[in-house]
């Protein structure tokens, strides 16, 4: 139900019924073509985040935050350590007509989300970054996630699935779902019984 278009193209008539995401990725990661990004978009499309508050860690171009909002999320808190990604996310947010109170963007990491979210609890964490970075910030997920909240991890290689399971299980996380595309994997976690 999602169509990702470069900002400068018109929507082809046969796709007018889809949710359109306009992007000008610049130099930030996230055009929608990478398998890890596609896995995340498919996960959001299959289980829309209606009314949820989202954290997008390593937001890149903002594509996952924008997708979540297009699919009914209440708001997003997006962070990246790259200032070019922050600029790209702000530009793409404006291209898709989202105000700053819907798509909140911060330079930094999980600490900025913790410091800036009014409800103090995120419903869904999107984390499409490489496995070593996921492991470095993973222990902080429970500081921002609410009861029954979920985490969608992507950006990991298929051969890293077991390593990440072994990392998160002792922290109290349970694996709800694993999907793969090419050599890339997506893992959905939560803190409660499925």
Label each PLM-derived region with a short phrase.
Residues 27, 31-110:
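Conserved SAM/SAH cofactor-binding pocket of Class I
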């Amino acid at each position: 139900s999602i169509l990702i278009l470069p900002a400068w193209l018109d929507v082809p008539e046969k796709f007018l019924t889809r949710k359109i995401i306009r992007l000008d990725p610049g130099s930030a990661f996230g055009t929608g073509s990478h398998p890890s990004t596609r896995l995340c978009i498919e996960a959001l499309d299959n289980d829309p985040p209606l009314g949820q508050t989202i954290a997008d860690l390593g937001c890149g171009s903002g594509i996952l935050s924008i997708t979540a909002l297009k699919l009914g999320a209440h708001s997003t808190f997006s962070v990246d350590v790259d200032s070019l990604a922050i600029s790209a996310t702000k530009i793409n947010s404006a291209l898709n007509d989202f105000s700053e109170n819907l798509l909140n963007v911060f330079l930094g990491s999980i600490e900025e989300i913790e410091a800036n979210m009014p409800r103090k609890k995120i419903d869904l964490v999107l984390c499409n970054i490489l496995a070593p970075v996921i492991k470095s910030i993973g222990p902080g997920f429970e500081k921002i996630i609410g009861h029954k909240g979920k985490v969608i991890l992507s950006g990991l290689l298929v051969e890293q699935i077991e390593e990440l399971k072994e990392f998160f299980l002792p922290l109290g996380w349970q694996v709800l779902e694993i999907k793969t595309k090419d050599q890339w994997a997506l893992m959905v976690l939560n803190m409660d019984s499925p």
